[in-house]
């Protein structure tokens, strides 16, 4: 009987899990009435939002390089003269006066250029008002959207994708009866533009806007070609018409004159025509297959299945509304894979990084201009890149960093008299690096250093020494800036940033009368510690100048330690001025826990508890992207149930019907933060070991995952049951020792009890200073689960199976 029960349980588990393998679809029983109900398609360069209307189909279009303005700079040379006085005021505690001086001398009138829409392609169908049997979906396993419905007994279907293989958008429109397909195609563009017919294509030329005194010099040219089966294609001055066709394939090609952030001499029409001419050489079936193949090469690397009741027969918008009333693990998995889908669709090698809205934006001037906010948002976009097996999607960010390191040299020299390069809290297509938006938000010189963390993390995950060599100068340039910029605090004696802020926050809140401009915030100290340590370690690996390594180490030794304040919290500032009822969206001083690796529950338990107290004081409610961050932080806290509580908050008012994250409004970083957070709940490799299932919530009692990545070039497959690891298969790409951490005892060939320090260089973290602790508190320490640690000596290319004991 025992074995029969076990067999039945295994069968039920398999059936429950397998029900999610083929259900990675968003689907709806009505067209989109709002942009946040439309479905996103993208090939990294061309973005499309598909509304799925019956009478009128709207395809809202974006091209990743279509931004307002033209090459410009926003450095203010007055900053260098004002810098000594600003520092003097800060060190005297006159923060508001210092901030006012920064506003006067550090800013320009150029706060960044907005990412812009091209407009929409409108497809008008005749007499399709009274449609029935409506169905609309996005299949994220294929990156293909479709719409179907009936009118007067005739079934109409549309299928479209933004082709990774052919660099155009391709749409197939068909019907179940010959000759029943008639429609008109036109453009709706909110910008200065002209529409005409060119070479049997509907043609749009749109001009990007001027902005903040910077002339708009980018042009987008879009061509629409119809290839019909049956019927007739004709044109008026501004409309493409199809009459009585059996089916039609539309090819939509779009390009701009952008070449790089300094060069806009490209031929947008030549590029658009080139893409189009190549695409139409293939029939629809071939183009579709090649697109799916290219997309699947990335997406199919990782599979996640979690056991629960299957609600995939309900529309996605209804599942979102009901998420907190039941355990819909399938929706949690769909949302996880949707983040990977969005990253592939908005960030492929050779393109621009995903901006604040990825590549999807309906406005001339979007919220926050849909730029690159680098005091967390751009970084969060790329948190899932390595761990969820999409390392190639990181490449556009690395290319941007090269360009920012060039542009930021001038800013460092002109504004601060420093070597190296600097980036403040925002940038755009033109790689602006100066202070923007006002001192309260913009006087933060750490954006470049934080972004350099991604270079080091890519190396830790891939072991790619050629990559490290290529980008070493970018890291060194950022480190060089801080070697010059840091100043000795006259009271504490530490080397600190000044002026700076704790992102978008001040000790007295965020209002017009408060000041954020201070010296040596905890996040600054943590970021500077990382860039100096990572550059030091890269220098050693690449056999660079030993004297430079010594200089870096000397500066590291003079940085401020973290501090635990009077509320047993991790202090956000040098002074103990945190408020326990502070609910600000940024939790900047938690950087050292995530995405940093400076705070360990095992090596720094009191600090670990202080961060937990800070998280509890900040609360669980937040903007969409902040919720994404909190999922990761609570995963690092090894508290899967609290992480899941945050996930519930995400689905309660912070998720739009199309699964876009809601700040509100839409910001894509929250989607990526969620995906990274779920991965962090399943696998962690930051704390000198590979920790399997470190933060599994009660709701996810059984499941399996294949294709997660870990530092040291390891690939992890796992299955768990009853809330505990059942087995794991680990592939080693580079070889070397793998230290494995688990909450349950394990067994496996070659597995031995861990002793001493893990000598695998990919798992060696820099040692931080002991924290300074307020004399007003009684020390608090976390209650941790018992852990079992093992070492496994691996060989390159080999796989290892581990099971629970």
Where are these regions (language model features)?
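Alpha-helix capping and helix-loop boundary segments enriched in small/acidic/polar residues
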Residues: 326, 368-372, 385, 435-446, ...
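Hydrophobic h-region of N-terminal signal peptides that target proteins for export
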Residues: 12-20
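Well-ordered alpha-helical segments within folded domains of soluble proteins
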Residues: 376-386, 445-456, 523-533, 588-597, ...
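Bacterial N-terminal signal peptides that target proteins for export
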Residues: 1-9
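Acidic/histidine-rich catalytic neighborhood
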Residues: 477, 481-538
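Conserved catalytic-core segments centered on acid/base and nucleophilic motifs
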Residues: 331-335, 341-344, 450-487
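Aromatic-residue-lined binding/catalytic grooves and analogous aromatic/hydrophobic interfacial grooves
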Residues: 22-440, 455-459, 512, 533, ...
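Non-catalytic carbohydrate-binding regions of carbohydrate-active enzymes
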Residues: 457-458, 462, 466-467, 478-488, ...
């Amino acid at each position: 009987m025992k074995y029969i029960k076990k067999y039945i349980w295994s069968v039920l588990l398999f059936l429950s899990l397998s029900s999610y393998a083929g259900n990675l679809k968003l689907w709806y029983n009505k067209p989109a009435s709002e942009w946040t109900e439309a479905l996103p398609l993208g090939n990294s360069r061309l973005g499309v939002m598909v509304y799925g209307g019956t009478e009128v189909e709207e395809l809202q279009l974006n091209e990743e390089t279509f931004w307002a303005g033209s090459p410009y700079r926003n450095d203010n040379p007055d900053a260098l003269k004002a810098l000594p006085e600003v520092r003097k005021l800060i060190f005297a505690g006159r923060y508001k006066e210092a901030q006012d001086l920064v506003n006067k001398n550090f800013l320009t009138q150029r706060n960044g250029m907005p990412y812009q829409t091209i407009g929409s392609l409108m497809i008008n169908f005749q007499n399709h008002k009274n449609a029935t049997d409506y169905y609309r979906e996005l299949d994220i396993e294929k990156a293909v959207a479709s719409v179907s419905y009936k009118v007067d007994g005739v079934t109409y279907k549309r299928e479209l994708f933004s082709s990774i293989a052919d660099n155009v958008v391709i749409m197939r429109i068909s019907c179940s009866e010959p000759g029943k397909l008639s429609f008109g195609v036109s453009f709706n563009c909110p910008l200065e533009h002209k529409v005409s017919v060119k070479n049997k294509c509907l043609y749009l030329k749109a001009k990007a806007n001027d902005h903040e005194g910077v002339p708009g010099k980018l042009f987008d040219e879009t061509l629409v070609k119809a290839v019909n089966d049956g019927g007739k294609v004709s044109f008026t001055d501004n409309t493409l018409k199809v009459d009585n066709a059996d089916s039609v394939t539309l090819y939509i090609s779009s390009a701009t004159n952008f070449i790089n952030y300094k060069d806009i001499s490209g031929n947008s029409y030549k590029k658009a025509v080139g893409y189009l001419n190549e695409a139409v050489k293939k029939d629809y079936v071939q183009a579709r297959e090649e697109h799916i193949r290219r997309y699947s090469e990335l997406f199919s690397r990782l599979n996640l299945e979690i056991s629960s009741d299957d609600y995939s027969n309900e529309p996605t918008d209804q599942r979102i509304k009901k998420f907190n009333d039941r355990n819909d693990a399938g929706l949690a998995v769909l949302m996880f894979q949707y983040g990977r889908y969005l990253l592939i669709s908005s960030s492929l090698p050779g393109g621009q990084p995903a901006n604040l809205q990825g590549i999807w934006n309906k406005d001339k001037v979007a919220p926050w201009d849909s730029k690159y906010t680098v005091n967390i948002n751009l970084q969060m976009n790329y948190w899932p890149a390595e761990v969820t097996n999409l390392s190639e999607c990181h490449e556009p960010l690395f290319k941007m960093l090269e360009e920012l390191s060039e542009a930021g040299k001038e800013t460092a020299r002109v504004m601060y008299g420093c070597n190296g390069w600097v980036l403040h809290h925002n940038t755009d297509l033109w790689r602006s690096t100066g202070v923007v938006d006002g001192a309260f938000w913009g006087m933060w010189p750490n954006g470049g250093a934080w972004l350099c963390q991604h270079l080091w993390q890519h190396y830790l995950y891939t072991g790619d020494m050629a990559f490290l060599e290529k980008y070493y100068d970018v890291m060194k340039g950022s480190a060089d800036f801080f070697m010059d910029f840091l100043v000795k605090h006259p009271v504490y004696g530490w080397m600190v940033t000044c002026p700076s802020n704790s992102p978008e926050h001040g000790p007295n809140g965020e209002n017009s009368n408060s000041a954020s401009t201070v010296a040596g915030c905890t996040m600054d100290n943590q970021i500077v510690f990382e860039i100096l340590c990572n550059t030091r370690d890269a220098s050693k690996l690449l056999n660079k100048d030993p004297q430079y390594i010594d200089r870096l180490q000397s500066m590291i030794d003079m940085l401020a330690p973290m501090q635990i304040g009077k509320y047993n919290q991790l202090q956000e500032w040098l002074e103990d001025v945190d408020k326990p009822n502070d609910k600000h969206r940024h939790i900047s001083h938690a950087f050292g826990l995530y995405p940093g690796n400076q705070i360990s529950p095992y090596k720094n338990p009191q600090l670990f508890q202080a961060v937990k107290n800070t998280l509890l004081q900040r609360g669980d409610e937040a903007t969409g992207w902040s919720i994404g961050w909190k999922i990761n932080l609570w995963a690092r806290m090894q508290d899967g149930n609290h992480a899941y509580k945050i996930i519930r908050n995400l689905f309660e008012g912070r998720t739009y019907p199309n699964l876009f994250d809601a700040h509100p409004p839409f910001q894509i970083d929250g989607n990526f933060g969620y995906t990274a957070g779920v991965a962090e709940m399943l696998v962690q490799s930051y704390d000198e070991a590979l920790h399997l299932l470190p933060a599994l919530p009660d709701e996810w009692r059984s499941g399996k995952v294949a294709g997660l990545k870990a530092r040291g070039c390891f690939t992890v497959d796992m299955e768990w049951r009853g809330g505990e690891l059942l087995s794991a298969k680990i592939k080693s790409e580079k070889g070397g020792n793998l230290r494995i951490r688990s909450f349950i005892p394990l067994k496996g060939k070659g597995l031995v009890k861990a002793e001493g320090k893990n000598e695998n260089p990919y798992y060696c973290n820099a040692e931080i200073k002991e924290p300074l602790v307020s004399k007003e508190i009684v020390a608090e320490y976390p209650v941790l689960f018992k852990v079992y640690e093992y070492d496994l000596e691996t060989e390159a290319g080999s796989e290892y199976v581990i099971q629970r004991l």
